[in-house]
């Protein structure tokens, strides 16, 4: 047999192997799940698990008839068994053989006993949700040592005791840790993760000093622990030993005696000096003091500012000390080149627009400040200037992805943007370690706040016409970004309800747009919304349709009134788990009940609302090839707006797809479509 004759045989054998291997993996997942089910009590609620069908089915292996099982590319990636009245002692050892398992949630059941056996064997797990059960006992300090992929751990609402496992503080990717409402004792271990956003230990029995790395977190995360102290709680008291107290008192008395002696000596010497020389010296000292250390009225202004935050004061003090030699006129205009006086240039507030009131960095830092929010990138403050104007200062910590000149160029490019649905950038401040971006303050606040915050008397309700107006404006602003940034894969990159502000007429204004090029890659992938799209979580890539995915999530949020992050504590939240949230909307019976009741829309609007719901679902289709492109979403939303009696103007004429420059008319895009 010749060498050429052997090739068909080899290929045939390979084909046979592939045909057999594929179902083996599927059967392996099924066997593991059935073995796990056999260890549960009251498992009758697990519908479809005994159907004889594989857990993952469909053309691309992304569908599952097994209740609570989520699949991707033919393998199980998440197990979500919540509110099913399951009980007994949980044993997850059988799940260790499911290679692609990234997330498990057993929240709000009746499991008891110690932390599930075999949990440390799930080394690929990224999300662990065991909250609101009846687990008890101590957790071994090294339990999580081998689970390096963990991003989110939710153990709240149980009766765990003993010390918080030190291995949690050593998980390199950890961003979220919820341990509230347990019985943990001892001290909080050290947490040094750079991307850590939440460590909630409220309502335990912890004591000692809060680690410095957690000092900027929300104060409520540490409430209900009588023994805790340190930022953000009250300072810790230090009880000195008696000997140290006596020694300190003696040292103080000695210092006072020395100071009195020095003072008397200076007085005697000063009287012997000439009057003219004395005047010259006094004038020189006073002039120097005024230049370097500032004016008394500045100190009074700072002391009177009741809203000023400690973090903002720290930033102001650091900057004032660094910039103490800068003059009050050190202010830059948009045309300044980054090559001009690079050292002095870093002390300036650079304005990128010529239609805004000018103020200096010192003016801004002297203003009374109010903390608006804090997130993965940094913090936001409202600064009330002495002129009466209010601005928002956003302090970013992870903007070193490009060099100084490229940063200047990109900020000036953003400053030149002009669209009714974009909040314009006013100015920026550059330092290598941190950046400040300044925008106007919008009193109505964010869409997220109006959708989800507790209702206050007299607050405007977002009815159907307003919500449609918001969707239309958001889409138009996004289409404009797509047109002016044809080379950016993610023209917005961080589209979410908290980044949509509403002006007095409830016209939406997009914020935090076009920042992907300047944000560090690790942080952008960790925190920016576009990187939660399934094509990135599964294939490590983004596309021009990733922002469309974010738009779809936003449309569903606006229509249902449900905040995706609320599902985080129920195992339905960020990252790949948004699939379950979207799926829950898609599978809900499409009646008026799916919509937020606060919209108060009549039956005459139901057809338009359902049409917009379909558009939202098409925008966030899990399959990127089936997901509609932005130009199609624009056309469909404009059609809904026209059907509802909205404005006749369209943004289609100004939008061009980046891939093919397609100029298809709106009419060609308005045919009825089917989702299922």
UniProtKB/Swiss-Prot annotation:
Extracellular side stretches:
27-242
- Catalytic activity annotated for this protein? L-seryl-[protein] + ATP = O-phospho-L-seryl-[protein] + ADP + H(+); L-threonyl-[protein] + ATP = O-phospho-L-threonyl-[protein] + ADP + H(+)
Q: Per its record, how is this protein called by name?
A: Probable LRR receptor-like serine/threonine-protein kinase At4g31250
Annotated TM spans? 243-263
List the source organism: Arabidopsis thaliana (Mouse-ear cress)
Query: So which residues have sugars stuck on them?
Result: 42, 73, 83, 218
Query: At what positions is Phosphoserine found?
Result: 368, 446, 543
Which Enzyme Commission numbers does its entry carry?
2.7.11.1
